[in-house]
Amino acid sequence: MAAPEQIAGEFENWLNERLDSLEVDREVYGAYILGVLQEEESDEEQKDALQGILSAFLEEETLEEVCQEILKQWTECCSRSGAKSNQADAEVQAIASLIEKQAQIVVKQKEVSEDAKKRKEAVLAQYANVTDDEDEAEEEEQVPVGIPSDKSLFKNTNVEDVLNRRKLQRDQAKEDAQKKKEQDKMQREKDKLSKQERKDKEKKRTQKGERKR
């Protein structure tokens, strides 16, 4: 049974304390026992290897007990590590699932955005076509196609007259607005001066009255 590396530290701490209690050199035998447990696949192979190591300094009556104790502790450490590993795997799987769902949402939103963009472009294109058709129709109405006749020339003249009148009206309205603005400004200045003059007169009357007293 090969062991994960993460359980080696926990088991090694326990093993070192147990070897110290047996007055066995932990520096020599600790790493040796740990290596055997990690390399041997079956429980029987592990037990035989442990007995071969520990028989050098343990009596026969305690050898079996110590071997069983070491194997039991090793198995428990492996089980706890497996549970932690499974929990970690479950957490990793949950995070991966969440990331996948978020990625799907982003893709779906992007697809919706693309669809909305396409619909918008289609509407704009349709509107542009309609506008172009209307503009062409207006141009056809304003500028008759074909050989100019007296009637078409008369229509063109009328259109120009209307446009000129509108331009004159706009210019006149602009000029009137500017004049009104200047008049209002002048009136405000007059009102301001009149108000100041009244204040000055009132002030002078007050000063005269005080001097008479």
From Swiss-Prot:
Compositional bias (Basic residues): 201-213
Residue numbers spanned by region Disordered: 127-213
Keywords of this entry: Coiled coil
Compositionally skewed regions (Basic and acidic residues) per UniProt: 169-200
InterPro entries linked: CCDC43
Compositionally skewed regions (Acidic residues) per UniProt: 131-142
Recorded coiled-coil stretches: 119-206
Family: Belongs to the CCDC43 family.
Name recorded for this polypeptide: Coiled-coil domain-containing protein 43
Natural source organism: Danio rerio
Gene name linked to the record: ccdc43
